[in-house]
């Protein structure tokens, strides 16, 4: 069967009603794009943007010495080729990294005699090795010391300005106190806050507070500048005895008129006394031409002057700026003949006097005093000078080296405060500070909004690239100090750049980050889904983030802006709930680190197919329709009013007001949650468990894709990177279990390409979680594959679809109490058919070291062991592949020299006579630990460079080399064949210009005759250059070109493979003191057994309680026994009804499969099968596909479908109940999906009908074999002498206080005494007991438990004199 037919995505019947607008973005692009932006490898050095690694270098360099006579400048960086490839790094325990070289320039200056001029004396440019930088693999992971790790993206508070209030909790009066905080990317924090007296204070770096005006004065502003910036002024006029003020419409709103406002021309009263100036009244006044409003002198008393009021005749200041005007002062102003002056507009309703009050309590006058005051607060104890104060203040907020808002911070500041500062200005400006304070004062006065710190516009994502950029910056700053010191200590003119640069501090920081940072995690490799989810995880924890203990409820909660960006379902249970989240399906991260989600644009009530990505801030204020809002075929909304989201609320809006629409219903949830069919029918808590448990599903021996899926299975399998995907279009040349060779189509590759793809498959490799990674080909020889097709399945994938569990026939009914409380009753059939058998691979390592007493040796010659024990070891002391081992068996034989003991003269004599005996070595072989039983599937040996190789190493090397040579020969063969076919096309039928003879003198090509295909086939290809065509130079040129390209390609292939073989034979880099290292891999087959944990996809989990013989299971009318019996009581209270709908739809899918099987068995006509399939699918595209199939292809499709027709019920747009009923009808089942079951033991029918169907059930990684544990004797704790605890320590079972009570209640005194003494920490007693058992006696002589001695010592250490008095018996 043509591969493309078997693998056609159309075979999964899809219930989706909404057309797909855009494809789901690659699921691991978040990792790959971030690292790509960080390295900018595909950009030439001179064209690189100021971001990532380039930005770090440019921000730290140039480095100048203290006297500024030399500077070290950065030019560019480049990366070399990694020493080992990914596979080798895995095997050798190395880091997959590339060497980095940085080109730097050392410029030395001559300082001239003229002040502040200098000339260049010398410039030296050099490329300096700068350590290694880890590279990301194709799948978005890093390989550090041989293990795959993932850098989790961090969700942290975005830099910018944030306004908040204390909710009235700070002061006892319950007054709401507002505050503002400016958070930079790096640098000092700036806080402004009001106290309960409405005075505005500022804190720098959370130090002691001071009046905010101190900071503003330090910025160079005077008191009157500040007052006039924060307050508006009113102009007051004396007109004889009358007092008037200028009618400013902006200030008049909501003020009251002191006296009637009358139009002097008509005498009409426009505003009555004590009435407010409304907008209508102000407009009326303007129409009547009233420019001045009469006021009373009482209104003016208590107002504040906004400028100095000066006597025009003498120049004397009558009232200073910020002075309160009293009755007397006003009289004085009037008497001096000052007719106009200005006062601050403060009405204590909409404008309060808080800022003016702050100026009053601030006793500092000048900018210099303000600078010194700030210096005193930040550096208490240091004597302040104006110069040091100024330099400290400049460095705080205005020096790009010390303070960085980042582009994001600047963007947020501009957005919040309405500024137009360019984005490349990344320090604070004076205007920024003023505007921050202005907004805070407005906020207090009731204008503006406080910020919600959980809004995704105020939180951003730091992905791998940015996290690593910060580490590099830390490392470079450390290196900068060292370089400056070196420049000052040595003569710079004699130095080269490499003498100054030591990259060790940088490498150390990066190494530490990858090795031990909280965000660098051991990849969860249980199955493909867990890998993908791990790479898409967002964590609020980690350096610079939150801590579990301090995180409150708000941070963890779901926020309206999470919609389409962060999954509201998938998060861990336990202390990290809500702090670790997962990116939604369609979400992506923009250049500023904000999470964006796609929307379709709506224009005039019509939805378009144009898609744009919006961040949470950009989305604010838009009306967004749901993806399932009803539209007609032209894209117009059907309803007049549509439910939409706007600014975090659900509202009904008219269709013309809609601006955006969701692209898909599943855009809300993450990848794991989108794999749960009928998610919309599950309770959210159970859905959370379901999405978490899918990540723990163990890859099974036989992958089986779900009958009821969601359509996401193919996407996850494709993007996870576990399956092998075709790189080019081509035809499969050869296939075996471990490699696939594809000959590329001619139009696919250029002249330089080899024209052949060889895919070496991964066979039985060990994952991080000890599960088995194995790839199996799904193509056959002759299949034509297209670029992007899956050609080999990986773990947990089936025909390119994710397959985490098995489709099993389940019945919901109680059965003999074996499914009480979530227990699961399973049929022995599942065990017999290996449906839930999984392979786990354990790695054991043995190291031979060079010790002080001599070298350890790996050998089969071990003293005091019988032949039976050593039967499976080869002569090198390593176990053979295929050996079945049990706990205690030797895997690698190793002997270690013993310390020399003093020998007696007699022993020395005997030793001199009989030679050295084997007494000076001890057996330190690697043995199989308890609980491990399996088959040896591999061994790897690493020897020091230059050391002699043992037989086993040579054997392994030969096998590897043979594999490489086979690849080499296949590549050469295929490109030769393609060259030959091209040449034949050119030459056959053309007239030969020269004759060509064979080695025996026989003429193969006759001059002047047409060249035949047989003649060409008889000539070896290396002699084809002798062939020439008459009167056709262009053909000759083409032939020569093809032959020369062929030879070049063959040379390249040989060179590449020779290099690989060389690498293979080279010794290994081992840690100091290690002579040889051997790793042995054991495959353990785990069948399903009682105690294993299983789960569905809806959070329905349970433990296998009994495995029942097939014949005892309840069976259907046709005699088929069910495979699993679940408890119906597990559904109602948990509210995960999705599992029942899945069971019904699975039952229909299975039933349709049985119908097809019946048709095939009866050899029904193909048209009948085709009609039935068309009926089932009811899909135009599928009908078209079925019509293109011939009988054989149709029968192959039918065979594939007889196990059940796979269905996709996508999240939030899945099959309706009617849809399920329709499918049940087509399968020939009752609409209730309930059947009569019969008891397997008695054969009687059960009283009630039972819900039966097919459910997808997973086996989780919590296997009973890993948990069961027993101990007789083992290690003891040093202090208490009690057995250690836990399986890993081979510990004992704790017998605590409550258990002692139980024993006491039963009066089991002797048993209890035994428990508390010889079985625990009575050292002497347990030794006596051991000896007694060896001698065959069974006496119990308990002594004093060691814990009693510990207690006495503790009391003595507290200074209490406790003595133990022994009763001497007479």
Curated annotation (Swiss-Prot):
The cross-references to PROSITE patterns, in alphabetical order and at most eight, read: RNA_POL_BETA
Q: Which keywords does this chain's UniProt record carry?
A: DNA-directed RNA polymerase, Nucleotidyltransferase, Transcription, Transferase
In short, the EC number is: 2.7.7.6
Q: Which InterPro entries match?
A: DNA-dir_RNA_pol_bsu_ext_1_sf (IPR042107), DNA-dir_RNA_pol_bsu_external_1 (IPR019462), DNA-dir_RNA_pol_su2 (IPR015712), DNA-dir_RNAP_su2_dom (IPR007120), DNA-dir_RNAP_su2_hyb_sf (IPR037033), RNA_pol_bsu_bac (IPR010243), RNA_pol_bsu_CS (IPR007121), RNA_pol_bsu_protrusion (IPR007644)
Q: Which residues cross the membrane?
A: none
Name a GO CC annotation attached to this entry. Answer: DNA-directed RNA polymerase complex
Instruction: Report a single Gene Ontology molecular function.
Output: ribonucleoside binding
Q: Which CDD domains match?
A: RNA_pol_B_RPB2
Any one biological process term the GO annotation gives: DNA-templated transcription
Reactions this protein catalyses:
RNA(n) + a ribonucleoside 5'-triphosphate = RNA(n+1) + diphosphate
Q: Keyword Transmembrane on this protein?
A: no
Question: Pfam families from the xrefs?
Answer: RNA_pol_Rpb2_1, RNA_pol_Rpb2_2, RNA_pol_Rpb2_3, RNA_pol_Rpb2_45, RNA_pol_Rpb2_6, RNA_pol_Rpb2_7
Tell me if Nucleotidyltransferase is a UniProt keyword of this record. yes
Oligomeric form and interacting partners: The RNAP catalytic core consists of 2 alpha, 1 beta, 1 beta' and 1 omega subunit. When a sigma factor is associated with the core the holoenzyme is formed, which can initiate transcription.
Which HAMAP family does the annotation name? Answer: RNApol_bact_RpoB
What does this gene product do?
DNA-dependent RNA polymerase catalyzes the transcription of DNA into RNA using the four ribonucleoside triphosphates as substrates.
Q: Which family, according to UniProt?
A: Belongs to the RNA polymerase beta chain family.
Name-wise, this protein is DNA-directed RNA polymerase subunit beta
* UniProt source species: Geotalea daltonii (strain DSM 22248 / JCM 15807 / FRC-32)
């Amino acid at each position: 069967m043509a591969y493309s037919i078997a693998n056609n995505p159309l075979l999964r019947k899809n219930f989706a009603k909404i057309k797909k607008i855009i494809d789901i973005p690659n699921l691991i692009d978040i990792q790959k794009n971030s690292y790509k932006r960080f390295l900018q490898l595909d950009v030439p050095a001179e064209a690189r943007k100021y971001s990532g690694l380039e930005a770090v270098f440019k921000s730290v360099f140039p480095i100048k010495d203290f006297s500024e006579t030399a500077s070290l400048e950065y030019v560019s960086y480049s990366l070399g080729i990694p020493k080992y490839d990914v596979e080798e790094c895995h095997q050798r325990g190395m880091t997959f990294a590339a060497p980095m070289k940085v080109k730097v320039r050392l410029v030395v200056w001559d300082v001239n005699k003229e002040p502040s001029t200098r000339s260049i004396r010398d410039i030296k440019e050099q490329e300096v090795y700068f350590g290694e930088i880890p590279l990301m693999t194709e799948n978005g992971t890093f390989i550090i010391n041989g293990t795959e790790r993932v850098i989790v993206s961090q969700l942290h508070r975005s830099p910018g300005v944030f306004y908040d209030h204390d909710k009235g909790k700070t002061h006892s009066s319950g007054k709401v106190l507002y505050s503002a905080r400016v958070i930079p990317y790096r640098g000092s924090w700036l806080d402004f806050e009001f106290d309960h007296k409405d005075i505005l204070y500022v804190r720098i770096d959370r130090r002691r507070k001071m009046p905010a005006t101190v900071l503003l004065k330090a910025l160079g502003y005077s008191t009157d500048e500040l007052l006039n910036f924060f307050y508006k002024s009113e102009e007051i006029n004396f007109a004889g005895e009358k007092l008037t003020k200028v009618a400013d419409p902006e200030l008049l709103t909501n003020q009251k008129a002191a006296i009637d406002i009358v139009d002097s021309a008509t005498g009409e009263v426009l505003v009555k006394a004590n009435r407010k100036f409304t907008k209508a009244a102000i407009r009326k006044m303007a129409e009547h031409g009233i420019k001045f409003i009469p006021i009373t002198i009482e209104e003016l008393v208590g107002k504040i002057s906004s400028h100095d009021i000066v006597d025009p005749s003498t120049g004397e200041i009558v009232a200073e700026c910020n002075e309160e005007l009293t009755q007397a002062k006003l009289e004085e102003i009037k008497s001096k003949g000052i007719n106009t002056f200005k006062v601050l507009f403060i009405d204590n309703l909409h404008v309060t006097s808080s800022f003016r009050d702050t100026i009053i309590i601030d006793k500092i006058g000048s900018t210099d005093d303000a600078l010194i005051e700030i210096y005193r607060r930040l550096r208490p104890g240091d004597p302040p000078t104006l110069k040091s104060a100024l330099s400290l203040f400049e460095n705080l907020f205005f020096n790009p080296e010390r303070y960085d808002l980042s582009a994001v911070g600047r963007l947020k500041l501009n957005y919040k405060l309405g500024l137009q500062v360019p984005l490349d200005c990344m320090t604070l400006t004076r205007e920024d500070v003023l505007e921050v304070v202005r907004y805070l004062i407005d906020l207090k006065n009731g204008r503006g909004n406080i910020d919600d710190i959980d809004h995704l516009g105020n939180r951003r994502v730091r992905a791998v690239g940015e996290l690593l950029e910060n580490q590099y910056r830390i490392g470079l700053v450390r290196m900068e100090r060292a370089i400056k010191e070196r420049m000052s200590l040595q003569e710079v003119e004699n130095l080269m750049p490499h003498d100054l640069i030591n990259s060790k501090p940088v490498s150390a920081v990066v190494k530490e980050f990858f090795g031990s940072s909280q965000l660098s995690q051991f990849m969860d490799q249980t199955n493909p889904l867990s890998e993908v989810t791990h790479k898409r995880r967002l964590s609020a924890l980690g350096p610079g983030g939150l801590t579990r203990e301090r995180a409150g409820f708000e941070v963890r909660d779901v926020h309206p802006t999470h919609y389409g960006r962060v999954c509201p379902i998938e998060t861990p249970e336990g202390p990290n709930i809500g702090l670790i989240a997962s990116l939604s399906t369609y979400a992506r991260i923009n250049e500023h680190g904000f999470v964006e989600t796609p929307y379709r644009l709506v224009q005039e009530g019509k939805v378009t197919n144009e898609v744009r990505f919006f961040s949470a801030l950009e989305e604010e204020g838009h009306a967004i329709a749901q993806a399932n809002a009803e539209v007609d075929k032209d894209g117009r909304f059907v309803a007049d009013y549509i439910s939409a989201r706007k600014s975090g609320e659900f509202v009904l809006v008219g269709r013309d007001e809609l601006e955006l629409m969701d692209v898909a219903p599943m855009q809300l949830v993450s990848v794991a949650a989108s794999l749960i069919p009928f998610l919309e029918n599950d309770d959210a808590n159970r859905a959370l468990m379901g999405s978490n448990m899918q990540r723990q599903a163990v890859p099974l021996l036989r992958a089986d894709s779900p009958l009821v899926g969601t359509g996401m299975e193919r996407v996850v399998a494709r993007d996870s990177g576990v399956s092998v995907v075709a790189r080019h279009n081509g035809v499969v040349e050869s296939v075996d279990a471990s490699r696939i060779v594809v000959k590329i189509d001619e139009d696919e590759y250029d002249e330089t390409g080899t024209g052949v793809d060889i895919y070496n498959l991964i066979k039985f490799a060990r994952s991080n979680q000890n599960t088995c990674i194995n790839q199996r080909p799904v193509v056959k020889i002759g299949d034509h594959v297209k670029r992007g097709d899956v050609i080999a399945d990986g773990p947990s994938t089936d025909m390119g679809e994710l397959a985490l569990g098995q489709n099993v026939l389940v019945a919901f009914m109680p059965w003999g109490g074996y499914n009480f409380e979530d227990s699961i009753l399973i049929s022995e059939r599942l065990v017999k058919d290996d449906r839930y058998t999984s392979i786990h691979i354990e790695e054991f390592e043995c190291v031979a070291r060079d010790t002080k007493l001599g070298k350890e040796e790996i050998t089969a010659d071990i003293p005091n062991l019988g032949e039976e024990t050593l039967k499976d070891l080869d002569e090198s002391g390593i176990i053979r592949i295929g050996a079945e081992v049990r706990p205690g068996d030797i895997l690698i034989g190793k002997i270690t020299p013993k310390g020399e003991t003093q020998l007696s003269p007699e022993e020395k004599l005997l030793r001199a006579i009989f030679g050295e005996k084997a007494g000076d070595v001890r057996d330190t072989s690697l043995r199989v630990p308890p609980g491990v039983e399996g088959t040896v599937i591999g061994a790897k040996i690493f020897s020091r460079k230059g050391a002699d190789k043992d037989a086993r190493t040579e054997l392994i090397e030969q096998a590897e080399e043979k594999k490489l040579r086979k690849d080499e020969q296949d590549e050469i063969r295929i490109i030769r064949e393609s060259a030959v076919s091209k040449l034949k096309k050119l030459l056959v039928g053309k007239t030969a210009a020269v004759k060509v003879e064979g080695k025996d003198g026989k003429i193969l090509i006759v001059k002047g005759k047409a060249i035949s295909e047989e003649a060409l086939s008889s000539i070896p290809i290396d002699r084809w250059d002798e062939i020439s065509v008459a009167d056709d130079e262009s053909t000759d040129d083409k032939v020569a070109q093809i032959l020369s390209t062929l030879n070049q390609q063959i040379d390249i292939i040989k060179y590449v493979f020779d290099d690989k073989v060389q690498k293979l034979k080279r010794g290994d880099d081992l840690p100091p003191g290690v002579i040889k290292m051997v790793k042995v891999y054991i495959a353990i087959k785990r069948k399903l057994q009682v105690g294993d944990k299983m789960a569905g996809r809806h959070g329905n989990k349970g433990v296998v309680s009994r495995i029942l013989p097939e014949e005892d299971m309840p069976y259907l009318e046709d005699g088929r026994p069910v495979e699993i019996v679940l408890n119906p009581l597990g559904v109602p209270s948990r509210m995960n009804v999705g599992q029942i709908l899945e069971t019904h739809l699975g039952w229909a899918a299975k039933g349709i499969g049985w119908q097809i099987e019946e048709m095939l068995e009866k050899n029904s006509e193909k048209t009948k099968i085709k009609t039935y399939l068309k009926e089932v699918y009811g899909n135009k595209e599928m009908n078209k596909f079925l019509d293109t199939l011939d009988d054989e292809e149709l029968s192959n499709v039918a065979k594939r479908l007889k196990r059940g027709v796979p269905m996709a019920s996508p999240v939030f747009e899945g099959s309706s109940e009617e849809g399920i009923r329709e499918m049940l009808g087509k399968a020939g089942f009752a609409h209730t999906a309930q059947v009569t079951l019969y008891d397997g033991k008695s054969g009687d029918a059960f009283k009630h009908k039972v819900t039966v169907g097919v459910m997808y059930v997973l086996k989780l990684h919590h296997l009973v074999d890993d948990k069961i544990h027993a101990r007789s004797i083992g290690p003891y704790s040093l202090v208490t002498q009690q057995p250690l605890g836990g399986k890993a320590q081979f510990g004992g079972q704790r017998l605590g206080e409550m258990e002692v009570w139980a024993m006491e209640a039963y009066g089991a005194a002797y048993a209890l005494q035994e428990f508390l003494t010889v079985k625990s920490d009575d050292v002497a007693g347990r030794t006596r007991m051991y000896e007694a058992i060896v001698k065959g006696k069974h006496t119990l002589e308990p002594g004093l438990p060691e814990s009693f001695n510990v207690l006495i010592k503790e009391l003595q250490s507290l200074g209490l004199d406790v003595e133990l008095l022994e009763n001497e018996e007479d």
